[in-house]
């Protein structure tokens, strides 16, 4: 039986869910089929933009560009308003599904010419043992090897043969060192698994035992080896931390340190000449097996913060094929625009922000779109969790229903990965369902109310984004006498704050219209 508080909460949530009723998009009860994103999110008139579209069912439709004056369809708002562009001709486009493949991993492609011996070693710390995953794999045209957890147990797959590499179960958040000596010529493997630290960082490093096992394996031949960490040959992913990987192929040694090249997705080798690349942005600069608890940031002791934390649901870049590449007209006015796709399976709008062309005249006023905040909340599922709590999921709009059914869209900073760790990265290189007209009651939609308000007052204004200020600094703000914030300018980088303070010292006037800002 529902408590009175649950009933009241349910009534409030139902009102929130029913706020956004518009005939321009899918309605509650409809199944959302079409989605997409664009790159970049903010650009100047005359620059190039790409739109990436996908539909779960093949659909024919028309794509056009609209200038969005107001994206708020609520009864209390000024009214939804958009204007198709005459300067960009609509296109008939057939959409098919472009899959999402989340999950971070690392990869190096290593030279090999039918080696006799291969040895592999690395530290690993499982963080989600209830889910099976491949910790490391080696693949060639003529064979493969996978190291994986099957529940609590560490196992190996060598060609068609599987073995348990350690009889004792693994423990979550405990560091282990695995060393495999693979004698391909003799078809034998020696596996050593050492446990060198407790689950508590406050304790000293201890030798807690080593397990050694030998196996006879099927014949495996390697030419070039695709060496992956946290990924299998079939694309499966793993949750946990890995540090200090090394692989020796006959006499060629390859070693990498994840404490190096922290600003890059590619790690140069300590030994050998093959780089190792990260995909879907695992968390870097996290504590490794030798962290002693004395240092609280990676810059103080990089050799102790030398691990990468992989998650099966990390998503930095959807990696879709561009559906359309477009050069915007030079004379396009600054404003909020959308790619609008109207097809047999529904309608989807993907917003983007246009600044004046580099040679164009600027307005005196700019509306600063808080895109950093949009990204922090991107694809958040807070309303979904609230709806589940009170049994009101049927009241969700299609965008939220879609998010509930598609965790492969990635997470926001307001969620946790299934292993309990926080979400470090939130990206715009994926469909962001709340970055849609009318999709949410805060962030983007009410910011379009401000745009409509200024337009209604016939106040000439340009659009600038957080990303522009972070990238260009003072130069992005300098043309303007007045900056108007969005309704929720919550997240600011140091570069943004420095630029804003310098702009104000030079005489700029800031109109803060936010209810939660400048953290």
Predicted regions and their residues:
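Short, hydrophobic beta-strand segments
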Residues: 51, 182, 320-332, 354
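Aromatic sugar-binding surface patches on proteins
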Residues: 88-104, 304-325
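Short beta-strand segments of immunoglobulin-like
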Residues: 38-43
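Proline/serine/threonine-rich low-complexity linkers at boundaries of modular beta-sandwich domains
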Residues: 6-33
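Extracellular glycan-associated modules
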Residues: 45-50, 70, 74-294
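Short, aromatic- and glycine-rich surface loops/edge beta-strands on solvent-exposed regions
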Residues: 335-341
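Aromatic-Pro/Gly-enriched surface loop or interdomain linker
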Residues: 58, 68, 285-316, 346-476
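Helical hinge/lid and interdomain linker segments adjacent to catalytic or ligand-binding clefts
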Residues: 313-316, 325-327, 331-333, 439-519
């Amino acid at each position: 039986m529902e408590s009175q508080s649950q009933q009241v909460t349910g009534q409030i949530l139902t009102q929130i869910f029913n706020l956004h009723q518009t005939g321009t998009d899918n309605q509650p009860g409809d199944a959302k089929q079409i989605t997409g994103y664009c790159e970049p999110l903010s650009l100047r008139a005359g620059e190039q933009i790409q739109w990436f579209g996908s539909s779960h069912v093949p659909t024919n439709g028309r794509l056009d560009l609209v200038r969005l004056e107001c994206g708020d369809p609520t009864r209390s708002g000024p009214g939804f308003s958009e204007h198709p562009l005459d300067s960009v001709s609509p296109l008939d486009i057939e959409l098919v599904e472009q899959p999402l493949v989340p999950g971070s991993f690392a990869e190096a492609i290593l030279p090999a010419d039918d080696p006799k011996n291969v040895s592999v070693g690395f530290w690993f710390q499982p963080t989600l043992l209830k889910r099976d995953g491949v910790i490391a794999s080696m693949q060639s045209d003529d064979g493969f090897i996978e190291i994986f957890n099957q529940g609590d147990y560490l196992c190996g797959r060598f060609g068609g043969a599987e073995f348990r590499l350690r009889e004792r179960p693994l423990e979550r958040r405990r560091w282990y060192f695995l060393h495999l000596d693979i004698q391909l010529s003799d078809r034998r493997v020696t596996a050593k698994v050492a446990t060198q630290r407790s689950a508590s960082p406050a304790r000293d490093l201890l030798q807690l035992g080593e397990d050694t096992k030998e196996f006879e394996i099927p014949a495996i031949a390697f030419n070039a080896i695709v060496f992956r960490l946290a990924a299998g040959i079939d694309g499966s992913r793993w949750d946990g931390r890995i540090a200090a990987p090394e692989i020796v192929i006959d006499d060629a040694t390859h070693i990498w340190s994840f404490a190096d090249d922290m600003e890059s997705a590619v790690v140069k080798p300590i030994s050998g000449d093959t780089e190792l690349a990260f995909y879907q942005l695992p968390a870097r600069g996290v504590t490794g097996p030798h962290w002693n608890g004395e240092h609280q940031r990676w810059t103080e002791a990089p050799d102790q913060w030398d691990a990468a934390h992989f998650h099966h649901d990390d998503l930095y870049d959807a990696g879709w094929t561009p559906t359309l590449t477009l050069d915007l007209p030079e004379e396009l006015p600054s404003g909020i625009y959308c790619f609008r796709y109207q097809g047999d399976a529904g309608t989807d709008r993907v917003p983007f922000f246009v600044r004046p062309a580099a040679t164009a005249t600027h307005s005196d006023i700019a509306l600063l779109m808080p895109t950093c905040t949009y990204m922090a909340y991107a694809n958040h599922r807070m309303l979904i969790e609230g709806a589940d709590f009170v049994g009101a999921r049927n009241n969700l709009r299609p965008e939220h229903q879609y998010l509930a059914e598609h965790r492969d869209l990635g997470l926001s900073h307001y969620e946790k990965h299934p292993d309990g760790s926080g979400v470090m990265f939130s990206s715009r290189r994926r469909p962001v369902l709340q970055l849609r007209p009318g999709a949410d009651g805060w962030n983007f939609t009410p910011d379009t109310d401000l745009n409509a308000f200024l337009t209604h007052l016939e106040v000439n204004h340009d659009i600038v984004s957080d990303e522009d200020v972070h990238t260009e600094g003072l130069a992005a703000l300098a043309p303007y006498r007045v900056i108007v914030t969005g309704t929720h300018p919550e997240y600011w980088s140091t570069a943004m704050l420095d630029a804003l303070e310098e702009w104000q010292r030079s005489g700029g006037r800031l109109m803060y219209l936010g209810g939660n800002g400048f953290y």
